[in-house]
Amino acid sequence: MTARRAPAVNRDVLEQMLIDGTAALDIVLTDAQRNQLLDYVALLGKWNAVYNLTAIRDPRQMLIQHILDSLSIVPHLRGRTDARVLDVGSGGGLPGIVLAIVQPGWQVTLNDIVQKKSAFQTQMRAELKLTNLSVVTGRVESLQPGGEVPEKFDMIVSRAFADLSDFVKLARHLVAPGGSIWAMKGVHPDDEIARLPEGSRVKQTIRLAVPMLDAERHLIEVAVDEAN
């Protein structure tokens, strides 16, 4: 059985969707950043069959459910210009590649345990010319500052990676003083929050509005005690 082909969509259509979506999110992109994001969508579609990156094949839905979904967290994270960011369970590079494109002053590290996904991420770093992006393969709980990663991170983010309590347990040792863990979720994860480990607490819960997407989205910020 042959794989179902993605529908052809004119780049101008995607560009207008991106312009409208970023305007709704109050995000201003340069022409270069907009083209990088559109190139990323095209590359996701091109290499999806090889790397098994996403079940979504329609470029319009990729733009909405991957790019705009990832962009929706930017207004809540962009308080500083030089942040060190770790994207855990990054898969096809979401949200980390999007963050690296729109926040060029950030140093973004993508992490996944699957070598094939890391290979795609490395390819995207080269093709999109993202000098502020790095890739590390392995389990997040095994990463050590000064070893697999150079130092701890100001922000550790994930998108559909794991149960919130598990995410915090696995990644808390990589949070820099004053830093936070940020989890992108669908419906509000009350049960997951109730299971948060000792020494961690929800700092804020943000209901996200993703343009053109009729679905619940939440961003949960978790602070962890430095002693843990």
From Swiss-Prot:
Task: Fetch the HAMAP family from UniProt.
Answer: 16SrRNA_methyltr_G
Q: Does the keyword rRNA processing apply?
A: yes
UniProt GO cellular component terms? cytosol
Presence of the UniProt keyword Plastid in the record:
no
- Please state what the protein is called: Ribosomal RNA small subunit methyltransferase G
Where found in the cell?
A: Cytoplasm
**Annotated SUPFAM superfamilies:** S-adenosyl-L-methionine-dependent methyltransferases
Q: Which InterPro entries match?
A: rRNA_ssu_MeTfrase_G, SAM-dependent_MTases_sf
Which keywords does this Swiss-Prot/TrEMBL entry list?
Cytoplasm, Methyltransferase, rRNA processing, S-adenosyl-L-methionine, Transferase
Q: What is its main location?
A: cytoplasm
Q: Which EC number applies?
A: 2.1.1.170
List the source organism: Burkholderia vietnamiensis (strain G4 / LMG 22486)
- Indicate which residues the UniProt annotation says bind S-adenosyl-L-methionine: 89, 94, 140-141, 159
Give the record's family classification. Belongs to the methyltransferase superfamily. RNA methyltransferase RsmG family.
Described purpose of this protein according to its UniProt entry: Specifically methylates the N7 position of guanine in position 527 of 16S rRNA.
Q: According to the UniProt record, what class of enzyme is this?
A: transferase
GO molecular function annotations of the record: rRNA (guanine-N7-)-methyltransferase activity
